[in-house]
Regions:
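Rossmann-fold dehydrogenase core element
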Residues: 92-110
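Short helix-capping segments at alpha-helix termini
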Residues: 13-14, 73, 98-102
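N-terminal Rossmann-like dinucleotide-binding module
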Residues: 1-34
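Conserved small/polar residues in nucleotide/adenosyl-binding loops
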Residues: 122-124
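Beta-loop-alpha module in the N-terminal Rossmann-like domain of NAD(P)-dependent dehydrogenases
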Residues: 5, 37-96
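Acidic-histidine catalytic/liganding microenvironments
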Residues: 12-14, 48, 113
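Short active-site oxyanion
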Residues: 15-19, 52-54, 104
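Active-site Tyr-X1-5-Lys
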Residues: 117-118
Length: 124
C-alpha cells in the first residue's frame, strides 16, 4: 500500500515525498531510487524534521504506536485501514487525534469497486 501512496504523491502537483521510514532492506533501495532520506524509525525522523503530514501504511499491530506518536507532535495522519487490530487501540488513536486537535484520516480506497471503476465511462 505504501508504494501506491508514493506513486500518487509523485503524480501530485500539491504534494511531495519528503522521506521514508522503513526498517526493511527494501527501504534502502527505495530511498535511493526516489532520492529521499530514509529513517529507521519515527523517533529519528521527528528529531530532525516535522513533516506537514504523514501516511502510515505499516502492519496493523503498529498503527497505534506510530499514529499516536505523530498526532502528539501535531502532525496530520492518513492511516491505512483498519484503524487498528483491536477496539481499545482504535479508541486510543481516535482520542489522541481529538486531544491533540490534529487531523486523522482513515484510508479506505474503492479501487476494486466495479461502480467506481466504471465512473470513467460516463461522459457528461
Amino acid at each position: 500500500m505504501g508504494l501506491q501512496h508514493i506513486k500518487a504523491i509523485q503524480k501530485s502537483k500539491l504534494a511531495s515525498l519528503h522521506s521514508i521510514v522503513e526498517i526493511k532492506k527494501t527501504g534502502i533501495e527505495l530511498s535511493k531510487k526516489l532520492n529521499v532520506p530514509l529513517y529507521k524509525n519515527i523517533k529519528i525522523l521527528l528529531a530532525k524534521h516535522k513533516p506537514d503530514a504523514v501516511i502510515i501504511a505499516t502492519p496493523n499491530v503498529l498503527h497505534e504506536t506510530d499514529t499516536v506518536r505523530f498526532l502528539k507532535s501535531k502532525i496530520p495522519v492518513l492511516l491505512e485501514k483498519p484503524i487498528s487490530d483491536n477496539i481499545k487501540s482504535a479508541k486510543k488513536i481516535i482520542n489522541s487525534a481529538r486531544s491533540n486537535k490534529t487531523s486523522l484520516l482513515i484510508g479506505y480506497h474503492r479501487r476494486h469497486n466495479s461502480i467506481v471503476n466504471n465512473l470513467s465511462l460516463i461522459h457528461i
